[in-house]
Amino acid sequence: FMHTVRIPKVINFGKNALGETEYPKNALVVTTVPPALSDKWLAKMGIQDYMLYDQVKPEPSIDDVNKVISQFKDKNPSVLIGLGGGSSMDVVKYAAPELKKQKILIPTTFGTGAEMTTYCVLKFDGKKKLLREDRFLADMAVVDSYFMDGTPEQVIKSSVCDACAQATEGYD
């Protein structure tokens, strides 16, 4: 039997990958974190001339995706950047193809692996659905240990549990 592995076209990883990656102007950055934290991350990235959407909720729904699409389709972002955990990356995975834009995924935690897969988890009518489409694959993933520095032990434990949950929740 033949097997196929699909991975992002570009994977920048390592210490300071975040700062050494070049980001397009007029990018839409989608995140779940408050501005005090996202501002620090965006400064580390060196990104300039961007739009920010920080209203993504944990375990997002298709309604969250539609809010991003309706709010930004006329602003014509050059690219969508999912910065954060699986929630922000999953919103970008679904929204970017709808807007006919490329996507850059930057995980700030570990556990979901969302930056590397063709899977997207969203709620439809209150029920979580695991979707798999090639269009959900990132055009670029940026993985930097910067986000692990100072991560509280409880967050690390939660991320390990999340990795286990992600491995099993797709089975209905």
Question: Where do the model's predicted regions map?
Answer:
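Short glycine/serine/threonine-rich phosphate/pyrophosphate-binding segments
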Residues: 21, 36-39, 62, 87-94, ...
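Alpha-helical scaffold segments in soluble metabolic enzymes
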Residues: 20-23, 67, 71, 94, ...
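ATP/NTP phosphate-donor binding region
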Residues: 1-79
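Structural motif
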Residues: 10, 26-28, 78-81, 102-107, ...
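A glycine/threonine-rich phosphate-anchoring loop and its flanking beta-alpha core
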Residues: 98-172
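A short, small-residue-rich loop immediately preceding and capping a beta-strand
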Residues: 72-108
